């Protein structure tokens, strides 16, 4: 992580009982010591509101990737998997794009995918995933909630998982935004 670049962290996504939700915290950090913003919006609706996308990593890089991913969604008529694979191939194959420091979670009602700059497109086995500095905390909390509090909605699971991450990770705050499909 560059000491002068702006970074944003912790995105969590879950599909549960026919619902889909994605949550992101609001913290943007300059290097490793300064909080630059506490109310960033890192989860976006794309493709006429049918797709959610969230990022962890460099803010400027993530916006570039959002634009490219939305272009791919348009090109492939909203086909999430095809758009994600095409973005990953372009990202991996382009010398300038390979320099981007961000990861994406993208989801629609039917699938959740993580897209990385090394060309991976990964679908989680258990319909939940998290990325960013607090990702492991959010993922652990989410798995526990899914197993032992299945009466919760996807939105509640997403919020509570990120809340746990914000209690532990110094790069994740509790200004949580949740989007649902």
UniProtKB/Swiss-Prot annotation:
Pfam families: Proteasome (PF00227). This is ATP-dependent protease subunit HslV. Allosterically activated by HslU binding. The keyword Cytoplasm applies. The active site is at 9. GO terms for cellular component: HslUV protease complex; proteasome core complex. It is an enzyme of class 3 (hydrolase). Gene3D superfamilies: Glutamine Phosphoribosylpyrophosphate, subunit 1, domain 1 (3.60.20.10). It comes from the Bacteria. GO terms for biological process: proteolysis involved in protein catabolic process. PANTHER family: ATP-DEPENDENT PROTEASE SUBUNIT HSLV, METALLOPROTEASE TLDD. Na(+) binds at residues 166, 169, 172. Keywords: Allosteric enzyme, Cytoplasm, Hydrolase, Metal-binding, Protease, Sodium, Stress response, Threonine protease. Protease subunit of a proteasome-like degradation complex believed to be a general protein degrading machinery. It is found in: Cytoplasm. Its EC number is 3.4.25.2. Belongs to the peptidase T1B family. HslV subfamily. It catalyses: ATP-dependent cleavage of peptide bonds with broad specificity. One of its GO terms (molecular function) is threonine-type endopeptidase activity. A double ring-shaped homohexamer of HslV is capped on each side by a ring-shaped HslU homohexamer. The assembly of the HslU/HslV complex is dependent on binding of ATP. The keyword Protease applies. Its main location: cytoplasm.
